[in-house]
């Protein structure tokens, strides 16, 4: 029987209708966060898709020292708290160091471990100590079966509810490729699997001082992942991605999200029909 992670009234499982995890790459300010959350909550409510809001208070792995990192943990968590209280939606955000975990867990329902840090034992242990759901993004450098080692660490630290995210694998220089077999392989660990459709089209360092991306392939990869069968779809969304402070080339435009989700719901239903 496939593992199901429960979060409030949301059930996350590979055999259940997919959950959408979405929001802008980084927290840009209170007004912008509330604007995005309102749009996403209304849309997912209309389409009857369970929704978790995602945004980052710090982009600690920017390509360049000049890259905009975000508002920081204090201001960022304050804004995420407003989103959570105003729209009654769960929150996921990333932590980059052990010192951030306890404070972040006061607001976030899910702690996300960035792909580059997925093997950092001390960070995994600190996240585990919070008692929150821990969502780990598979490193671009890891084979899908290597996530078993991450699972073993988390379970040793007492984590009961784990989510793993596929976000592509390094394919030569400045490029990622999505191996859809990875979704099935990770699911064999009996962990709900999330597909990150927007970071999977990244071109790391592809613009020299920043990361490039191929937004036009987001929908294609999202359809493929949904056809395989996933617990969650992760998408970074922005009303004006070309002018966003980070990951603009990868994020999808807010106005285009509804049509994509309608298609994904159809794929999801067919895949999970008994």
UniProtKB/Swiss-Prot annotation:
Enzyme class (EC, first level): transferase
GO function terms (MF aspect): 3-deoxy-8-phosphooctulonate synthase activity
Family of the protein in this entry: Belongs to the KdsA family.
One BP annotation, GO: keto-3-deoxy-D-manno-octulosonic acid biosynthetic process
Protein name: 2-dehydro-3-deoxyphosphooctonate aldolase
Main location: cytoplasm
Alphabetized SUPFAM superfamilies for the sequence: Aldolase
Assigned keywords, A-Z: Cytoplasm, Lipopolysaccharide biosynthesis, Transferase
GO terms under cellular component: cytoplasm
UniProt keyword annotation of Metal-binding present: no
Location of this chain's protein in the cell: Cytoplasm
Organism, scientific name: Rickettsia felis (strain ATCC VR-1525 / URRWXCal2) (Rickettsia azadi)
Catalytic activity as recorded in UniProt: D-arabinose 5-phosphate + phosphoenolpyruvate + H2O = 3-deoxy-alpha-D-manno-2-octulosonate-8-phosphate + phosphate
Record EC number: 2.5.1.55
Coiled-coil ranges from the UniProt annotation: none
Pathway annotation: Carbohydrate biosynthesis; 3-deoxy-D-manno-octulosonate biosynthesis; 3-deoxy-D-manno-octulosonate from D-ribulose 5-phosphate: step 2/3; Bacterial outer membrane biogenesis; lipopolysaccharide biosynthesis
């Amino acid at each position: 029987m496939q593992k199901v992670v429960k979060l409030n009234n949301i059930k996350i499982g590979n055999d259940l209708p997919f959950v959408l995890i979405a929001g802008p790459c980084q927290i840009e300010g209170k007004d912008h966060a509330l604007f995005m959350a309102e749009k996403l909550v209304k849309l997912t409510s209309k389409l009857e898709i369970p929704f978790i809001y995602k945004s980052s208070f710090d982009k600690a792995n920017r390509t360049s020292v000049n890259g905009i990192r975000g508002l920081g943990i204090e201001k960022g968590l304050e804004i995420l708290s407003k989103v959570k209280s105003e729209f009654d939606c769960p929150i996921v955000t990333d932590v980059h160091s052990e010192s951030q975990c306890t404070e972040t867990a006061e607001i976030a329902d899910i702690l996300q471990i960035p792909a580059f840090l997925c093997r950092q034992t001390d960070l995994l242990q600190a996240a585990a100590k919070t008692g929150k759901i821990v969502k780990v993004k598979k490193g671009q450098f890891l084979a899908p079966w290597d996530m078993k080692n991450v699972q073993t660490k988390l379970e040793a630290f007492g984590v009961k509810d784990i989510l793993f995210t596929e976000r592509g694998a390094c394919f030569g220089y400045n490029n990622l490729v999505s191996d859809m077999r990875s979704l099935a392989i990770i699911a064999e660990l009996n962990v709900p699997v999330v597909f990150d459709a927007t970071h999977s089209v990244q071109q790391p360092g592809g613009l020299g001082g920043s990361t490039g991306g191929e937004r036009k392939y987001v929908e294609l990869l999202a359809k493929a992942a949904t056809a395989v069968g996933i617990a969650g779809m992760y998408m970074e969304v922005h009303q004006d991605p070309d002018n966003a402070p980070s990951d603009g080339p990868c994020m999808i435009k807010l106005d285009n999200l509804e049509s994509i989700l309608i298609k994904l719901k159809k794929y999801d239903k067919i895949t999970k029909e008994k």
